[in-house]
């Protein structure tokens, strides 16, 4: 969102029967404008975001926007811009939704980065890691409440005059993707191209790990002064997110230690399961890495480029459901978390094990290698390759001096790539991600997968505080696209005992698959299918499959 500071089109107007008096325009973007305002009831300054009039024409969208604002208002954290109120009012004869927010005296992170780039070429790594850790602290809170941001970028992060990080615009991207406005058609996604995760670019369902990818993009930008993927068109940028590998940040900024390269590389994995399992885990790693090296001024490599999208001309991007089937086989080099003793600190990829996968396979424990010497980590089971073709159920501030990266609506990018010389065909292979898992006998059946009945060395006990309310099952969220359907709740990271109580209250059926994993402890739900947010018919509720941790470390 650009910063203005002048008089906006609504300056001098009032909202909510005169309670909120709009003053200076603070910023304006593709979806909304933000004004400084005075709350005459509580005698304080606030910031008011008014959605552009074309977005408020349909009642269904306004209702979705209101519900999202209510959800965001429940988020309370030092690093989150508070939401005080929401409503709609007539401005220039048009119904205009608005949100009343905490007024942050400061400037966007993009402006802070611009200054660092002018002075040093990039932001110092220790400063960037601390800011990133604070952003992740905010996301940790929102993810625990089931709210995915969907549009993390420097323009949505504020820095106060005292250096406090504030993340804003939670829920705005989700409200935009309601599928009910004239601007948003089926198979379309909303976001900022430079920060989209591969699954967002593909129009697939997203979860907390999509935000972590966007945080990885932002961290790359902070420590290098440029974006890992940038091109002349949103389509080319989205193609790069799905198909291209980013350069190591140290190839741009020679002052960066290998641990920063490894941290960013993990955050930017195409397969969500190969990223950090949670905002908390990524935050801990940022702080660990920040404490592991001596801070040094950035040393930018002259002429280093990160241009992308060269292969987009040979790719076809039809709407979801209209793509040609991709050939079978692995999509990308399988994940191997064990570092090798050789010059490559990230290890030599090992063949992927063949196993059924439904959506996202189990995330194995992994820690970014230490800067020197590289710590030998315990190898985790290699997850199946991530299927980059659309699933059958298909859920629905740029670099300094760079191109505009305002939020735009992009066609869902199905990577049904035209085979050119056999090369593209080798890139896109179906890793079995759309195969159905073996059917279980009953709703409470449990299939044990490499689970050990005893507590192995490294065992982590259960965290029974991670609970889910029963009403998440008995009164689930109604689908935004079909009033006759509901959305599957988010059970990930919750304790299985609490989840079972939720299921029993609603009369739902589950299938539990035990997996060896000691990141969150015994009984923690690590994955689910259908994924959270999937639209289902409550009259024909499918069996929900849950991957649950045994608390034991992954077998070597």
UniProtKB/Swiss-Prot annotation:
Coiled coil residues, start to end: none
Chain segments carrying region Disordered: 300-403, 435-485
Domain Protein kinase: 20-287
Keyword entries, A-Z: ATP-binding, Kinase, Nucleotide-binding, Serine/threonine-protein kinase, Transferase
GO molecular function: ATP binding; protein serine kinase activity; protein serine/threonine kinase activity
Keyword Nucleotide-binding: yes
Active site, renumbered: 151 (proton acceptor)
EC number: 2.7.11.1
Name of a matching Pfam family: Pkinase
Comp. bias regions, Low complexity: 360-381, 445-458
PROSITE patterns reported in the protein's UniProt record: PASTA (PS51178), PROTEIN_KINASE_ATP (PS00107), PROTEIN_KINASE_DOM (PS50011), PROTEIN_KINASE_ST (PS00108)
Gene3D superfamilies: 3.30.10.20, Phosphorylase Kinase, domain 1, Transferase(Phosphotransferase) domain 1
Residue ranges, compositional bias (Basic and acidic residues): 461-475
Keyword Transmembrane: no
Catalyses which reaction(s): L-seryl-[protein] + ATP = O-phospho-L-seryl-[protein] + ADP + H(+); L-threonyl-[protein] + ATP = O-phospho-L-threonyl-[protein] + ADP + H(+)
Compositional bias (Pro residues): 336-348
SMART domains: PASTA, S_TKc
InterPro entries listed in its UniProt record: Kinase-like_dom_sf (IPR011009), PASTA_dom (IPR005543), Prot_kinase_dom (IPR000719), Protein_kinase_ATP_BS (IPR017441), Ser/Thr_kinase_AS (IPR008271)
Binding residues annotated for ATP, in chain numbering: 26-34, 49
Domain PASTA: 482-550
SUPFAM superfamilies named among the record's database cross-references: Protein kinase-like (PK-like) (SSF56112)
Family label: Belongs to the protein kinase superfamily. Ser/Thr protein kinase family.
Protein name, per record: Serine/threonine-protein kinase PksC
């Amino acid at each position: 969102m650009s910063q203005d500071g002048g008089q906006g089109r609504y300056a001098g107007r009032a909202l909510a029967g005169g309670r909120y008096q709009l003053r200076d325009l603070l910023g304006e973007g593709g979806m909304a404008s933000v004004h400084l305002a005075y709350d005459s009831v509580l005698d304080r300054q606030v910031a008011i975001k008014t959605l552009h009039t074309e977005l408020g024409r349909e009642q269904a969208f306004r209702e979705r926007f209101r519900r999202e604002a209510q959800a965001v208002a429940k988020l309370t954290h030092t690093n989150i811009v508070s939401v005080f109120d929401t409503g709609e009012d007539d401005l220039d004869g048009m119904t205009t939704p608005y949100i009343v927010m905490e007024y942050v005296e400061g400037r966007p992170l993009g402006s802070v980065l611009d200054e660092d780039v002018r002075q040093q070429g990039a932001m110092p790594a220790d400063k960037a890691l601390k800011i990133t850790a604070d952003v992740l602290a905010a996301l940790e809170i929102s993810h625990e409440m089931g709210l995915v941001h969907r549009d993390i970028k420097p323009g949505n992060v504020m820095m106060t005059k005292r250096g406090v990080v504030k993340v804003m615009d939670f829920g705005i991207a989700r409200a935009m993707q309601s599928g009910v406005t004239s601007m948003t058609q089926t198979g379309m996604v909303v976001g900022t191209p430079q920060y989209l995760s591969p699954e967002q670019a593909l129009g697939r369902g997203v979860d907390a790990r999509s935000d972590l990818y966007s945080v990885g993009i932002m961290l790359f930008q902070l420590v290098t002064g440029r974006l890992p993927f940038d091109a002349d068109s949103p389509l080319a940028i989205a193609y790069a997110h799905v198909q291209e590998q980013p350069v190591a940040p140290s190839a741009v900024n020679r002052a960066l230690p290998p641990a920063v390269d490894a941290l960013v590389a993990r955050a930017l994995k195409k397969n969500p399961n190969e990223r950090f399992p949670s905002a908390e885990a990524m935050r801990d790693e940022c702080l660990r890495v920040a404490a592991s090296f001596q801070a040094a001024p950035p040393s930018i490599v002259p002429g280093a480029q990160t241009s992308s999208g060269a292969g987009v001309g040979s790719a076809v991007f039809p709407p979801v459901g209209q793509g040609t089937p991709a050939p079978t086989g692995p999509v990308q080099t399988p994940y191997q978390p064990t570092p090798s003793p050789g010059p490559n600190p990230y290890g030599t990829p090992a063949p992927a094990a063949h196993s059924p996968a439904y959506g996202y396979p189990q995330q194995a424990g992994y820690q970014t290698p230490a800067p020197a010497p590289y710590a030998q980590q315990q190898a985790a089971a290699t997850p199946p390759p991530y299927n980059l073709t659309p699933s059958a159920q298909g859920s629905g501030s740029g670099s300094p001096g760079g191109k505009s990266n305002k939020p735009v609506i992009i066609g869902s990018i199905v990577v049904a790539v035209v085979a050119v010389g056999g090369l593209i065909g080798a890139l896109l292979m179906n890793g079995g991600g759309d195969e159905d898992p073996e059917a279980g006998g009953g709703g409470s059946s449990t299939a044990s997968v490499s689970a050990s009945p005893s507590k192995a060395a490294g065992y982590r006990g259960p965290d029974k505080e991670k609970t889910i309310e029963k009403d998440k099952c008995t009164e689930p969220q109604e689908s935004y696209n079909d009033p006759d359907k509901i959305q599957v709740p988010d059970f990930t990271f919750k304790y299985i005992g609490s989840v079972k109580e939720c299921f029993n209250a609603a009369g739902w059926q589950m299938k539990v698959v035990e997996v060896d994993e000691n990141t969150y402890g015994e009984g923690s739900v690590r994955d689910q299918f259908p994924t959270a947010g999937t639209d289902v018919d409550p009259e024909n509720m499918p069996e929900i499959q849950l991957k649950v941790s045994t608390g034991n470390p992954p077998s070597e």
